[in-house]
C-alpha cells in the first residue's frame, strides 16, 4: 500500500497521506470523512485566503464548509495535504 496518493489538478501535484491505522483509506477520510474533492474545492476556492500558521509550520485555508491544512513540498508545484475537515469538527 502506498504511503501517499498523488492527484494532479490544474498544474499542481497534491499528496494525500494514507491513514496509519487504516492504510487502505486516506487520512482525511479515515479521520474526518472528507474526500479529495472536498480538499481540492477548498484549495481552488478563489474567495478564500491562505493563512500561515507559524506555530505548526503549515498553511490553513477555510471556506464556508471545510478547513484545509497544507504545506508546499515544492513551492508552486507539489502540495502536501496535511488534513481536511468540516468546520464542525
List where the protein language model places each region.
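Ribonuclease/tRNase effector modules and their secretory precursors
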Residues: 1-89
Amino acid at each position: 500500500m502506498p504511503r501517499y496518493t498523488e492527484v494532479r489538478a490544474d498544474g499542481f501535484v497534491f499528496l494525500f497521506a494514507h491513514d496509519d491505522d487504516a492504510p487502505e483509506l486516506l487520512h482525511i477520510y479515515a479521520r474526518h470523512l472528507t474526500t479529495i474533492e472536498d480538499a481540492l474545492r477548498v484549495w481552488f476556492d478563489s474567495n478564500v485566503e491562505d493563512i500561515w500558521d507559524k506555530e505548526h509550520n503549515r498553511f490553513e485555508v477555510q471556506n464556508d464548509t471545510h478547513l484545509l491544512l497544507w504545506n508546499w513540498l515544492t513551492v508552486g508545484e507539489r502540495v502536501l495535504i496535511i488534513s481536511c475537515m468540516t468546520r464542525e469538527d
